[in-house]
Regions:
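Acidic, low-complexity N-terminal propeptides/linkers enriched in Ser/Thr/Asp/Gly that mediate export
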Residues: 1, 9, 60-187
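Catalytic nucleotidyl-transfer cores of nucleotide-processing enzymes
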Residues: 1-61, 74-77, 81, 85-91
Length: 187
């Protein structure tokens, strides 16, 4: 892709056939399947396209806000797995019911003060390429139970803020970190 008419190009470890907007993307039909070109879309790619790709006038502040976006796209695979999990899994006790309510109420953001992000992250354990993440009806409930125990043990509650859980610790320096796996503010 060179000099696309959309004046927008990105690479977020996802489909090269969606590197820009519109007609300027490479045509997948021109590339044989044996090349093994992956076509999945990462959350970072979805968010970059949604933010940078739809804003006709990006200010300097917009650029930094978009670059450090801390949100999951509604169409990301992680959100699809969460929706399915909430439909299929029944809580076994009051703690699991509370954990599932945290997951249900999550706003898809990984801000420091968010009280649902830790439960979501520890239950689903998204990695850098959530586009490859597979739904696992046995693993996710088990990981939710582990998350409940770990959060209670380390934070005396199952809904600590994300900043209490996600930390950068180097020697005497101990700082909260916003962001997460496969968001533009990747951690």
């Amino acid at each position: 892709v060179e000099d696309p008419s959309a004046a927008f190009i990105h690479s977020c470890n996802s489909s090269p056939f969606k590197a820009t907007l519109g007609e300027d993307n490479p045509d997948p039909k021109k590339y044989p399947a044996y090349l093994g070109i992956e076509t999945f879309m990462t959350n970072r790619s979805r968010r970059a396209r949604a933010l940078f790709g739809t804003d006709p006038e990006i200010s300097r502040q917009d650029f930094f806000d978009y670059k450090f976006d801390k949100e999951y796209d509604p169409a990301s695979r992680l959100i699809g797995h969460i929706d399915r999990f909430l439909q299929e899994i029944e809580p076994e006790n009051a703690e699991q019911k509370q954990a599932m309510e945290l997951i249900r109420s999550w706003d898809r953001k990984t801000d420091l003060e968010n009280r649902s992000t830790a439960m979501v992250t520890l239950t689903f354990r998204p990695r850098s390429q959530t586009g490859k993440m597979r739904y696992d009806k046995d693993r996710f409930p088990r990981q939710m139970k582990e998350a409940i125990q770990m959060l209670k043990q380390r934070h005396s509650r199952i809904d600590p803020t994300w900043g209490e859980v996600n930390r950068l610790v180097r020697g005497k320096v101990d700082l909260p970190l916003a962001g997460g796996h496969d968001v533009l503010r990747a951690i």
